[in-house]
Regions:
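An N-terminal hydrophobic leader/cap segment in hydrolases
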Residues: 1-42, 52
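Conserved alpha/beta-hydrolase "acid-adjacent" motif
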Residues: 231-237
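Alpha/beta-hydrolase active-site loop
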Residues: 110-131
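Catalytic histidine neighborhood in serine/cysteine hydrolases
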Residues: 243-260
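The serine-hydrolase catalytic nucleophile loop
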Residues: 72-86, 99, 106-108
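Catalytic histidine-centered segment of alpha/beta-hydrolase-like enzymes
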Residues: 257-269
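Short beta-strand/loop motif that positions the catalytic acidic residue
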Residues: 217-219, 224-226, 230
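Hydrolase active-site cap/lid region
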Residues: 152-204, 266
Length: 291
């Protein structure tokens, strides 16, 4: 058992090892031929978020539908940009956000799935207040931790129109256990302490924020997408999420590719557009214009 004098050192080491790496942007929407505006969005704790706002094509009547895109852990909005042209062509205003401690957003004491979700809700509220956006047609798309975050955000914000989840895990405790195994940490000895420490730090019990528990709470349609070769989050998690949902409002698509392959998700992006079109949010595939 960990003795009290060692706890501050252990806690410091845990906080340090779990800190999300910050990646700088190397490209922007203009690199994909899209006009955009860089904006700052107020979040919690007096922090602000960097975001790229890509207005819907001019042929889309206002107020326009919108999609908020949330990256994964240690990533940024730049890495989600390959999805932008196809989603924009589907008639959507796009908002790519950097969550706190990521990309060009403000730093904070730590990053966590709930803080990702808090930032997502603030971004949605910011969008919904714009006169050019239809507040009833705002959908969410997230990858990995960002996928867990958009599911959590939608459980907090029941008016969410739809959710697209890319490579979501079923339960954060299981992700932590996989991480501990990769670090060769003695799970039986120190594992329970680490799990308690992380939950105490983030202010939430893992059960309260686990996608397998938040997904069944959602009122809106959900599309789960997962790569069959995902070595970070087992594809079995996607099937567990579908089973937990227990409703035909939740769809699952298993495709090629691994965990971080935006190219693999891009190859089946029409499924996302068609799913959103079925909810009255996007245009059907093939209806886009050439601007």
């Amino acid at each position: 058992m960990t003795t009290p004098p060692l706890r501050p050192l252990l806690n410091w080491g845990l906080r340090r090892s779990l800190r999300a790496p910050r990646l700088a942007h190397t490209r922007c929407p203009a690199d994909f031929g899209l006009a955009f505006i860089s904006v700052r969005i107020p979040s919690t704790l007096d922090k602000s978020l960097h975001a790229w706002l890509i207005p819907a094509p001019a042929s889309v009547p206002l107020p326009a539908p919108a999609l908020v895109i949330v990256h994964g852990w240690g990533s940024n909005s730049d890495l989600m940009l390959p999805l932008a042209p196809a989603l924009h062509a589907a008639g959507l205003t796009l908002l790519f956000i950097d969550t706190r401690c990521h990309g060009a957003s403000d730093d904070d004491t730590f990053a966590s799935l709930p803080r990702f979700a808090e930032d997502t809700v603030r971004a949605v509220d910011w969008l919904a207040a714009r006169p050019d956006i239809d507040p009833g047609r705002i959908a969410l798309l997230g990858h990995s931790v960002g996928a867990g975050a958009v599911l959590l955000a939608a459980s907090w914000r029941p008016q969410t129109a739809a959710v697209v989840s890319l490579a979501a895990f079923a339960h954060p405790a299981e992700m932590m256990q996989r991480w501990m195994a990769e670090q060769d940490l003695p799970d039986a000895v120190i594992g329970p302490y680490i799990l308690r420490y992380v939950q105490r730090t983030i202010g939430y019990r893992f059960d309260a924020i686990a996608p397998i528990n938040t997904l069944p709470q959602l009122r809106c349609p959900v599309l789960l997408m997962h790569g069959e070769h995902d070595s970070v989050v087992p594809v079995a998690d996607a099937y567990r999420l579908l089973a937990a949902a227990g409703t035909d409002k939740v769809q699952l698509h298993i495709g090629p590719g691994g965990h971080d392959s935006m190219e693999a998700f891009l190859a089946v992006i029409d499924r996302v557009s068609d799913f959103l079109a079925a909810q009255g949010i996007a245009r059907n595939t093939g209806e886009g214009d050439t601007e």
